[in-house]
Each structure stands twice: as structure tokens, then as C-alpha cells.
């Protein structure tokens, strides 16, 4: 049975089996995109690894196992593939979770997918160019007079890639808020009214996500998070007004 994306204008809703088949198709497409992107990223993994170790300067990480460098090589290739395949993965995800959109509403997918990819890329770039250059020297120099820092490549890559990934995810906040505003879960007034509480939550997120305990690195992450929250309010306002106009609410 061939399944397809159904709109609210169709009389018969999708059955449970059809939903499962639709999910299967979306997952297969996402996995295929990830595999192809990972194979492609293998061509640039060595260069990517060299870029990731730049924040360490002359303090190159060490490999303490015979296969550790090989494992890290393919892990980084997988991460590169995930980044390259992100637009396809996001598109497949959105196409599955919003099958009830009207045809004229589906054009928003053309905006959401590139916007999500752009925000994720901005988050990754911010982590690499702003947070890591400030965090790595601090960690390397902390108690350096009595402790010699010798990081393994596995620990270092886990720190770097984890930070870049989660900051990229955090940068998706405006789109999530805009979607919630579209559903009517939140409103611009609610977001603005709770701005002070949002600052507290942002501070907690920055404290958890920042790899160092110093306030400078925490502030480096808090600033863009506050700006993202303000952008979320603006997007929620635009979406909320469109929603009110479409439903005839005054």
C-alpha cells in the first residue's frame, strides 16, 4: 500500500498502519541521507579533525589506544554527515509530524527547513569561533602550575563535538517558539511577560552547557541566548498575527 501526505481537506484520515508506513518511509529517507552524507564527509574528515584541534594550539591531544584514532576518525565523519544531512532529516521529520496542514500552509516548510539548518549552523559556528577559543585555554591553564594537562583525543572530541551540537540545538529555539505560537500554546504577550523568568532559565542553561565554571564563558553563551529569546518573541508575534487573521480572531 502506497502512503502519501494527506491534508485536512481529505475526508478519510490516515489509519494507524498508514501512519506507521509513512514513518517508515521518512526514516528510510533520513537514514539514507545520513549514510550518503557520512560517506561524502569521509573525504574531508582529516581536515575537519585538524580544524577541531586548532583551539588547543600546540597542546595536541593524545591517543592511548591502538584503535582510538580510527574510532575518532569515523565518529567525526559521522558527525560531519549528520551536519550535511540535517536539512533532509529536518524536512522528513516536519513532513511526518504535520501531515494535517492545508496545502497553502505547506509552503512554510520551504522556510522552516533552510531556517532550521541556518540556525543550527550558526550555533555550531558560535561554539567553535567564540566559545571554544575562550574555554579551551582556560581549561588547559587551570591549575597548570601543579597539574600537567594531557587530554586524550576521545575526551577532547567528546567535549568539542558535544558543545557544538548542543549549542546548535539551542539556536533552534526561535523556530520551536514560533511553532508553539502557531499552535496557540504560547503568545507573544506571555513570552514578554515572563522575560525575567526566561533570563533565569537562560542563565541555568548557560551554566550547564558551558564547559568552564568562569562567568566570562557563561556570559558569552547567555548573550546570544537572550537575543534568540527576543527573536523568538518577534517570530511569535508575526506568527500569532497571521494565525489571528486566518481564524478571524479580533
Where are these regions (language model features)?
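Membrane topogenic/interface segments and analogous intrinsically disordered interaction regions
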Residues: 1-250
